[in-house]
């Protein structure tokens, strides 16, 4: 059985498409998240949340620590490509200290 993480990584090896929202969020001066960091999260990170019923299509939230900092990436695997919906640096006010669970 193919997992969503397998589908994400297979799609990423085919082609990666950064949606406009992702590009805008990655370019914010306080974030400056590179495409290399996003690709590191996609290829080596872990799934934190799975959104099978997302209106944009099945998507998920991944986390990794490229360059020693936590990065969250929301992406959606498609047959022809991996859509990067957004990428951001998680905020301790909204996430647990390990950045893996949302705060209450």
Name these PLM-found stretches.
Residues 1-104:
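Ribonuclease/tRNase effector modules and their secretory precursors
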